[in-house]
């Protein structure tokens, strides 16, 4: 990409799986921010005990004292700052070239349907700015919630900017801890919504029964068989039938939710893994066929893109669409969300609204994020 002297932006993201902090250095082609290049990226693993605490908090499994939560907010902020500093050091770029950091933080609770609604991400942005020396933009979701929106998903605006449909109806599928779809028709408004559990349940079940943090290449799931009764019980959750806009998280779709659906059935662990994988494929395909049946291309990003068994099941359920990695269009699937938060920071500093009311249900376009100066 040209314009090598244009400023860089650094995006930081840790999703519902809390499997690591993704950091991405991004350069935009011009001030429209409609073309971008990944200059460098890295993923920094969470310290195991800290990750355990974050996962437990994220699924609503425990409460925490205010003092402990304040310290956790600081710890997460320091971890994000360390990830940014590691990427800067590894990439060799000069700090002065980076105009801003966009930090998503770590979601510990997402309750868009509560009264009043709220969403909560921790990771003290003041500490990120202090320990990197770079202006930091954070707290992207709460303004959309304040405007009556779900506060999620936020990536559809970025997907539209980078992967606009052109001459076909297409979708962008992020397979993180939770799955979410962006529907980009040739004509008409973009829509986006969460589809339900993805890696979060698969990883948790694999950790419980294999002692490994994820199912490498989907091998554990491939060794089992889908249990039709369990799949039906899981899909019977009323959330799946809700129309968009909708969003969810570990608070709703956690491992105890799946175990409860099993009842007294004595199932092989591999069969459960196969069924959880099929749940992800089915929930995505059902939503896509219901809401944009003319989709011809599904561009996949997030950790799930490395699960060939999951991609094969998606392709089988979507015979009319090409299912492929976003890498085909020059956007690294491992860092697409981190790149998206770099983009959100750039959009705020440019004074442009970055939510899509057609996606989140907000009352209108809003500037997203708060600025923490260096």
Curated annotation (Swiss-Prot):
* UniProt KW Membrane keyword: no
Q: Which domain of life is it from?
A: Bacteria
Functional pathway: Amino-sugar metabolism; 1,6-anhydro-N-acetylmuramate degradation; Cell wall biogenesis; peptidoglycan recycling
Which residues make up the binding site for ATP?
A: 15-22
The record's EC number reads: 2.7.1.170
Q: What does the sequence similarity comment in the record state about its family?
A: Belongs to the anhydro-N-acetylmuramic acid kinase family.
What name does the UniProt record give this protein?
Answer: Anhydro-N-acetylmuramic acid kinase
Record the organism: Xanthomonas axonopodis pv. citri (strain 306)
The uppermost taxa in this organism's lineage are: Bacteria, Pseudomonadati, Pseudomonadota, Gammaproteobacteria, Lysobacterales
């Amino acid at each position: 990409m040209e314009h090598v002297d244009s400023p860089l932006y650094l995006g930081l993201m840790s999703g519902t799986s809390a499997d690591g902090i993704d950091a991405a250095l991004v350069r935009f082609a011009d001030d429209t921010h409609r073309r971008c290049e990944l200059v460098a990226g890295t993923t920094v693993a969470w310290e195991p005990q800290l990750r355990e605490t974050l996962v437990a908090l994220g699924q609503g499994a425990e409460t925490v004292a205010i003092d402990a939560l304040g310290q956790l907010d600081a710890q997460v902020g320091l971890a994000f700052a360390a990830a940014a500093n590691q990427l800067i050091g590894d990439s060799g770029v000069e700090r002065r070239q980076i105009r801003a950091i966009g930090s998503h933080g770590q979601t510990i609770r997402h309750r868009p349907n509560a009264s009043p609604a709220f969403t909560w991400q921790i990771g003290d942005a003041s500490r990120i700015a202090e320990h990197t020396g770079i202006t930091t933009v954070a707290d992207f979701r709460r303004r959309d919630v304040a405007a009556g929106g779900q506060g999620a998903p936020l990536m559809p605006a970025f997907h539209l900017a980078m992967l606009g449909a052109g001459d076909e109806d297409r979708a962008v599928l992020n397979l993180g801890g939770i799955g979410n779809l962006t529907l980009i028709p040739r004509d008409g408004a973009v829509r986006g919504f969460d589809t339900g559990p993805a890696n979060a349940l698969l990883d948790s079940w694999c950790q419980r029964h294999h002692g490994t943090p994820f199912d490498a290449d989907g091998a554990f799931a491939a060794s089992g068989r889908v249990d039709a009764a369990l799949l039906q019980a899981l899909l019977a959750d009323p959330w799946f039938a809700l129309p968009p806009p909708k969003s969810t998280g570990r608070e709703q779709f956690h491992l105890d939710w799946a175990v409860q659906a099993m009842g007294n059935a004595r199932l092989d662990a591999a069969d459960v893994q196969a069924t959880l994988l099929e749940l992800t494929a089915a929930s995505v395909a059902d939503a896509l066929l219901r809401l944009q049946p003319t989709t011809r291309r599904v561009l996949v990003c997030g950790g799930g893109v490395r699960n060939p068994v999951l991609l094969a099941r998606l392709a089988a359920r979507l015979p009319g669409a090409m299912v492929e990695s976003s890498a085909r269009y020059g956007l690294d699937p491992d860092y697409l969300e981190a790149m998206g938060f770099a983009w959100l920071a750039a959009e705020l500093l440019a004074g442009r609204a970055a939510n899509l009311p057609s996606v989140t249900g907000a009352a209108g376009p809003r500037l997203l994020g708060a600025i923490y100066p260096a």
